[in-house]
Structures are given as structure tokens and as C-alpha cells.
Regions:
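N-terminal segment of the canonical double-stranded RNA-binding domain
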Residues: 2-70
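Conserved aromatic
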Residues: 32, 74-78
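Short intrinsically disordered terminal tails
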Residues: 1-3, 89-100
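A short, charged, amphipathic alpha-helix used as a generic interaction element across diverse proteins
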Residues: 78-92
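N-terminal cationic amphipathic segment used for targeting or macromolecule association
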Residues: 4, 60, 81-85, 97
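Residue-level detection of beta-strand scaffold positions
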Residues: 61-62, 73-75, 87
Length: 100
């Protein structure tokens, strides 16, 4: 997938980097939220986020749960930033679909 793809997916949800605190930058200059900020964005939406390194596959798994502790979604990425950003894009898509 790659971090570029994850950032593309996040921007396609309407996410904006107006506040760049807690953000990294891609080579093309686009800002993206780093894992600590992503955790905060999940918390503000009522979800808990955990990101774990899966040594066997050398990847990261991001999983989020609702306030009841029920699994709400998960993604994998090659890096922790990729997994965090892609998880945020998927959570934003899911919550936008529910709101419609």
C-alpha cells in the first residue's frame, strides 16, 4: 500500500492539515498525522486505537474499538505511520457512512 496511498485515502475523506501539530510530512510536502495525533482523533470520535507490530509478517496492525470495547475495524500497514493514517481514513469513512 504505502504511506502515500494511506495519505491519499485520508485526504479523500476531507481531512485537512490546517493544524500541523503532531504531523509528519511526505516528500511532496503534504502533512499527515503521526500515530500520537491519530490516537487523539480516534479518542475524540469515541474510539480506542491500538497499533501493534506483528513480528512474523514485519507489519503493523491498527485496531479500533468503540466505547463498549467491541471491535469496530482494523487495518495493516508496512510502517506504524502507514497503519495509523490508513486506520484514520477508514474510521472517517465508516463514521461518515453512518452519519448519512
Amino acid at each position: 500500500m504505502g504511506l502515500d496511498f494511506a495519505v491519499d485515502q485520508l485526504y479523500s475523506t476531507g481531512w485537512s492539515a490546517l493544524d500541523t501539530r503532531g504531523c509528519g510530512r511526505l516528500d511532496d510536502g503534504r502533512a499527515y498525522p503521526e500515530p500520537g495525533r491519530v490516537e487523539g482523533e480516534f479518542a475524540s470520535m469515541g474510539f480506542g486505537l491500538t497499533i501493534k507490530h506483528i513480528q512474523l509478517f514485519d507489519c503493523y496492525r491498527a485496531e479500533w474499538r468503540d466505547s463498549d470495547g467491541s471491535a469496530a475495524g482494523s487495518v495493516v500497514g508496512h510502517t506504524i505511520d502507514e497503519a495509523a493514517v490508513y486506520a484514520l481514513s477508514q474510521m472517517r469513512r465508516a463514521t461518515a457512512a453512518v452519519a448519512v
